[in-house]
Amino acid sequence: MGSGGPLLLLRGLLLVGAAYCAAPRPPRHSSRPNVLLVACDSFDGRLTFYPGNQTVDLPFINFMKRHGSVFLNAYTNSPICCPSRAAMWSGLFTHLTESWNNFKGLDPDYVTWMDLMQKHGYYTQKYGKLDYTSGHHSVSNRVEAWTRDVEFLLRQEGRPKVNLTGDRRHVRVMKTDWQVTDKAVTWIKKEAVNLTQPFALYLGLNLPHPYPSPYAGENFGSSTFLTSPYWLEKVKYEAIKIPTWTALSEMHPVDYYSSYTKNCTGEFTKQEVRRIRAFYYAMCAETDAMLGEIISALQDTDLLKKTIIMFTSDHGELAMEHRQFYKMSMYEGSSHVPLLVMGPGIRKQQQVSAVVSLVDIYPTMLDLARIPVLQNLSGYSLLPLLLEKAEDEVPRRGPRPSWVLSEFHGCNVNASTYMLRTDQWKYITYSDGVSVPPQLFDLSADPDELTNVAIKFPETVQSLDKILRSIVNYPKVSSTVQNYNKKQFISWKQSLGQNYSNVIANLRWHQDWLKEPKKYEDAIDRWLSQREQRK
């Protein structure tokens, strides 16, 4: 960050705001725009509009809202890092990419939207976190996902905690993210400014994802919300909402499993919950400042008025809503993502209420680059919802559906999960659609998702389930995932040979496992002896 810090950056952007608004909108058939996508990790989309935006100062997101459009109902297609990013980079739903968990993503040679833009004349550049190809993440993460059908219940995460570092002068807390942000800024100022062709720039950030905790001891995994006093002062404590929790005995069975494996079934004081949420919001403020660095670099090089900017996240963060932290859930805190777009031709100060999802980014990028949109994509271009003038609309395939789909097949959840979101309803079903009860929430009357009304509205459940089955044969997909998990675990177990017992006893669940290791090994053996699920 420059010597003046975020405040000076913001003042500079406020001064250029009028000039940006007055900049002429390039005609539809003029040179193609530059495109920038900033994708962070674990950012709750509800913080980008009222009332969530009252909780923390996010000046650069607000700048994008004033000079562009914000989507009020944007969702991840899978609330976990790799599967979500696989959907975003491929334009395909998770059951089509078969990115079932954080270890299984796209093939390295898969043609992404950025590959096509490069093929059609764009100069492309990527910095930071990508995380959409196979073979990443820890052994613990893989094994926990593969064994979620085993009949045992083990804590897989550390109890969420906070950590305050530095003083009021400590701005750059997440050093890795600031380093890649600096690289992107340098590239803009030294390389992009001299290009004779349009560019597509991607910046991937780790924040506001919780930080890793010590592997051994009472806390392990990635459960630390870390920030400095500088960012914590951006949070309005009086506006922090303490979530209402359902009693453990009344929780949906999948929610209870998630809460237990995330180590959240113990006692938490209101002060603990408030601090966890405050530290998370402070991490969001630091993320916003990195976005500001990029916007300022574009302004300094006179590229801002020539560039379409998108800001989003792979998923959200529950931050102790529904007695959980992390993601891996279809509740709003986890599945609702930010999506803001600004640039030449984009409507300003617009709030878009249509339901959209991350698979829509692929066709949108192709539209921006004047590349014919592939017909097999799961997503639809966002441009018809964004462009200032009707004549600017690009040819597209059929009407946008009135729903979005999200699905989850990874760790911390013991059943494949499918979510269909419409304008009013959120329908969540599991596994084969029979063995686990569904959930239905009326988000217009119950935005906190505290009352499952599936029994009260059986016709709505039936109607939404019919739509869902027309999109995906989810019982078959669930069976496919179960068989995949078992085969992967068997292969991993065989690769360890005599070391299997020692290795599995030292994964993230080691504290619970070591209490009764024989019991848990026997449970795995029973699971392995069961017949393969029919597809």
UniProtKB/Swiss-Prot annotation:
PTM description: The conversion to 3-oxoalanine (also known as C-formylglycine, FGly), of a serine or cysteine residue in prokaryotes and of a cysteine residue in eukaryotes, is critical for catalytic activity.
Domain of life: Eukaryota
Catalytic activity entry: an aryl sulfate + H2O = a phenol + sulfate + H(+); Hydrolysis of the 2-sulfate groups of the 2-O-sulfo-D-glucuronate residues of chondroitin sulfate, heparin and heparitin sulfate
Its EC number(s): 3.1.6.1, 3.1.6.18
InterPro entries: Alkaline_phosphatase_core_sf, ARSK, GAG-degrading_sulfatase, Sulfatase_N
Main location: secreted
Gene behind the chain: ARSK
GO cellular component: extracellular region; lysosome
Cofactor: Ca(2+)
Keywords: Calcium, Glycoprotein, Hydrolase, Lysosome, Metal-binding, Secreted, Signal
Stretch forming the signal peptide: 1-21
Modified residues (3-oxoalanine (Cys)): C81
Organism name: Gallus gallus
Gene3D superfamilies per record: Alkaline Phosphatase, subunit A
Family membership: Belongs to the sulfatase family.
Subcellular location: Secreted; Lysosome
Listed name of the protein: Arylsulfatase K
Annotated positions binding Ca(2+): D41, C81, D314, H315
GO MF entry, a single one: glucuronate-2-sulfatase activity
Xref: SUPFAM superfamilies: Alkaline phosphatase-like (SSF53649)
